[in-house]
Amino acid sequence: MQYLKPINVFSEIGRLKKVLLHRPGKELENLTPSIMKRLLFDDIPYLHVAIQEHDSFADTLRGNGVKVVYIEDLISETLSNDDSIKEQFISQFILEAGIRTENKTRALKDYFCNMSVNDMISNMIAGVTRDDLKNYKSDSLNSLVNSEYPLIIDPMPNILFTRDPFASIGHGVTINRMSTKTRHRETIFAEYIFKYHPIYKDNVPIWYNRDEDTTLEGGDELVLSRDVLAIGVSERTESESVEKVARKLFEQKISFNTILAFQIPQSRAYMHLDTVFTQIDHTTFTSFISDDMKFTIYALTYDVSSGSIKVKSEKAKLEDILGFYFGCKVNIIKCAGGDLIHGAREQWNDGANTLAISPGEVIVYSRNHMTNKLLEEFGIKVYQIPSSELSRGRGGPRCMSMPLIREDI
């Protein structure tokens, strides 16, 4: 089936037809113990095994009829046919990498311009070391003071999690303002893809942009149905951003009539809504709830006559709230069945971060064996992938993927 729109995502569970990934690369080998926390990693993955695990993920998707595209290929296609756009992109990337001195900027421009576009993108993601710019010399105070730091531009290891920099909603996208400085550059790629790529330019409405002054990340955005969108208010996404997206969607008269704002604790363990809540079938969800992880849910609707957004606090249980908006009884499968120890362990390793590839079929990390067994007992078809290295970045199958096209349900 051919889709008239390049973005078509009106659910979390419609059969996945096209998805965006990033295959791990040298950026993981430029992680060091001194910078990994700042770059949001809890440990240093072993690249060779991380690639094997990610290839298993991509092969599982392809084996189920999903077209896999890689972000580095999309941005390379965007820049390859217009030198002026490429030069603009390079300048913006260098500036947003925190480079301010004229000599260093010139050296980096020369470095990036003297390679193919594909290699340039790979090296931008990998980060630039002092050894990469062997001909660059500077006696500025800044360079001398920081001469022991091996990196001129930090690597971008979090681009592995393609879910976050932008999010597909309906026929459009939010291009997000990331919460942490280290992830800001990731959204430059989305900006250029949707502005200049021949498939996406002029064809994709933008519901939110990266120059907004409040943060929004894709792991907090879940398209529950054509009518209902869920957005987390979390460590990474601010409540003001939820209202901005809601107003844009309501005023553009997109199909969504309700935005459910899920407030969750501001915690590394629960950084996004999809670390504690995902949809896996028409009426079935995975979730993690504990003494320190509870949902507070607000419903945002639009009053057409006044042009105002109405906000109502939902007081019922999660399953009852969802049941009301879905118009039927729903099932909640808790991580490890709600076991205090195993539930917390498996949530930490993304047991609730499932990726639905069609209704009732999900990709999960094999390590979360208790949760996976429960899914199978509920009749869910479970595709398990290895994750000893991928999980070190605190993201699961949903985090590592951005659906571009899903079949309507």
From Swiss-Prot:
Pathway: Amino-acid degradation; L-arginine degradation via ADI pathway; carbamoyl phosphate from L-arginine: step 1/2
Top-level taxonomy: Bacteria, Pseudomonadati, Spirochaetota, Spirochaetia, Spirochaetales
Subcellular location as annotated: Cytoplasm
Top-level EC class as recorded in UniProt: hydrolase
Name recorded for this polypeptide: Arginine deiminase
Keywords: Arginine metabolism, Cytoplasm, Hydrolase
Signal peptide: none
Catalytic activity reported: L-arginine + H2O = L-citrulline + NH4(+)
One Pfam family this sequence matches: ADI
GO molecular function: arginine deiminase activity
Active-site residue numbers: C399 (amidino-cysteine intermediate)
E.C. designation(s): 3.5.3.6
Annotated family: Belongs to the arginine deiminase family.
Subcellular location, principal: cytoplasm
GO cellular component: cytoplasm
UniProt KW Hydrolase keyword: yes
A biological process term (GO) from this entry: arginine catabolic process to ornithine
